[in-house]
Amino acid sequence: MNLIHTIYQPSGEGPFPTILTLHGRGSNAMDLLGLAPLLCGGKFLMICPQGPLETPIGPGMTGYAWYPMSMGGPPDVDAILSSRRELEDFIERCLASYPIDRKKLALLGFSQGGVMSYSLALTHPGRFAALAVLSSWLPKELEARLKVSDAVQALPTLIQHGTQDPMIEVDRARDSVQRLRQLKLPLTFREYEMAHEITPGSLRDLSAWLEEKVLKTRCSS
């Protein structure tokens, strides 16, 4: 594999409905793996790749990122697209290596991972059964560089954001939603009284949404 990653595999025999889960800046491949047993009773296979770039997160501490921090300037779109190419290769390797139900492959991204998820899903919407973006936004500079497929109009999309988010203000998510609706994505947008995080309430909503849009059968979270 070209990217370090962790995996949660349900009991039983596959192929399994699968979530490709992309972490935020400063985190690692373990960060979101704990969501797997909490989503629809652990029925999803979850694959969590690690961003290819090391980034300092404190004295003597290192995390990982998908692209460099812009320090208030526009995002480095070239770096985003470079990491997207790595993810495209990673997905192909995963499809060849793990018991993935290709018709039930969902994409989930948190924060910087959400930016990467937009880049992947808007370009290759037919590859994914659903897109969930948490505490993130779609940079205009990135959107301008994407060749957005008309197939996005059939991609169920969930966006969750905290009204108290100090890192990515909710207005950035709202602006992204407006632009995504112009692309005619079938989109659900939910705001929560939370910061830059996932809460029990937002997790319950995410689980129910994945059940409806991907599993199509009753499951418990």
Segment roles from a protein language model:
Residues V152-T157, L183-L185:
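Short, proline-enriched alpha-helix->beta-strand connector loops that line the catalytic pocket
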Residues H23-R25, L108-F110, G162:
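Conserved alpha/beta-hydrolase "nucleophile elbow" surrounding the catalytic nucleophile
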Residues L38-G41, V148-A154:
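Short, conserved loop/helix-junction motifs that constitute active-site signature segments
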Residues M1-I100:
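Serine-hydrolase catalytic machinery in alpha/beta-hydrolase-like enzymes
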Residues V170-S221:
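C-terminal catalytic histidine-bearing segment of alpha/beta-hydrolase fold enzymes
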Residues K103-V152:
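Primarily recognizes the serine-hydrolase "nucleophile elbow" in alpha/beta-hydrolase
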Residues L158-H161, D165:
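Short beta-strand/loop motif that positions the catalytic acidic residue
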Residues Q50, L108, L134-S135, Q160, ...:
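Alpha/beta-hydrolase-fold catalytic nucleophile elbow
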